[in-house]
């Protein structure tokens, strides 16, 4: 089991007269080597679940384990090291470094400027159709091109888990399909978790987690392996 979530609650304004539940009593188990979608209306808690799984949001109560390790038992430095080693992140905003070239931006997670690393980065940019922009700066690219560069950056360290939050929002439909096809290829060696409003990009998903008002209401199973029905709180 790659991720195990038990009795997870995430509460904002905890202790105040009015508390806001972002996540309510979430129980979930996820295996690796899959494409998992998280869907729900705005404010439903889907991004909160993604960031909690990634260790970027600490739960108000409950536990999250990754490869048998509870996040709550890790020091901040060990948590950071784990994310850097095993995780790749793709956010709705690209967060590219303005003064660096696209190629150098892609290389930042691995801090490696060797010929081999540069060739790997260029190969990723080529798969995403923007290799010709490797020497450009972020401001010279369109929004969709910058997002593709951010995707290449997330993949450069061969992560075991790829987290994506509305990653195709700035892409046209064809580009979105190309990106999801590339991410689907990574499921042979990684777990890919994608938050989206667009159900059409999840046509190849193994599971789609549906969230409403902070609770998992259902999981649509495309394929049965790796899905633990007993761990879902409905």
Task: Show the residue positions of the predicted features.
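Conserved ABC transporter NBD signature motif
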Residues: 62-71
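A short, proline-enriched helix->beta-strand linker immediately N-terminal to the Walker B motif
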Residues: 156-160
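Helix-to-loop junction immediately C-terminal to a conserved catalytic motif
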Residues: 54
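Catalytic Walker B motif of ABC-type/P-loop ATPase nucleotide-binding domains
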Residues: 162-165
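Short coil-to-helix segment of the ABC ATPase nucleotide-binding domain corresponding to the Q-loop/switch region
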Residues: 100-107
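Conserved ABC ATPase signature
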Residues: 137-147
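ABC ATPase NBD coupling module
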Residues: 20, 71-88, 228
């Amino acid at each position: 089991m790659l991720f195990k979530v038990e009795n997870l609650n995430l509460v904002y304004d905890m202790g105040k007269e009015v508390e806001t539940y972002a996540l309510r009593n979430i129980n979930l188990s996820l295996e690796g080597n899959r494409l998992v979608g998280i869907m729900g209306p705005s404010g439903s808690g889907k991004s909160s679940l993604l960031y909690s799984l990634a260790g970027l949001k600490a739960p108000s109560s409950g536990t999250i384990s990754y490869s048998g390790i509870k996040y709550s038992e890790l020091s901040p430095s060990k948590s950071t090291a784990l994310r850097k080693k095993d995780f790749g992140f793709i956010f709705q905003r690209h967060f590219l470094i303005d003064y660096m070239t696209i190629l150098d931006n892609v290389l930042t997670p691995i801090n490696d400027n060797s010929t081999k690393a540069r060739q790997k980065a260029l190969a990723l940019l080529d798969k995403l159709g923007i290799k010709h922009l490797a020497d450009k700066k972020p401001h010279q690219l369109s929004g969709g091109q910058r997002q593709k560069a951010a995707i290449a950056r997330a993949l450069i360290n061969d992560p075991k888990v790829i987290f994506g939050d509305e990653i195709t929002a700035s892409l046209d439909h064809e580009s979105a399909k190309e990106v999801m096809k590339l991410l689907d290829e990574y499921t042979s060696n990684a777990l890919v978790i994608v938050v989206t409003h667009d159900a059409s990009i999840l046509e190849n998903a193994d599971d789609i987690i549906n969230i409403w008002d902070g609770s998992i209401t259902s999981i649509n199973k495309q394929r049965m392996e790796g899905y633990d029905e007993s761990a879902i709180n409905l």
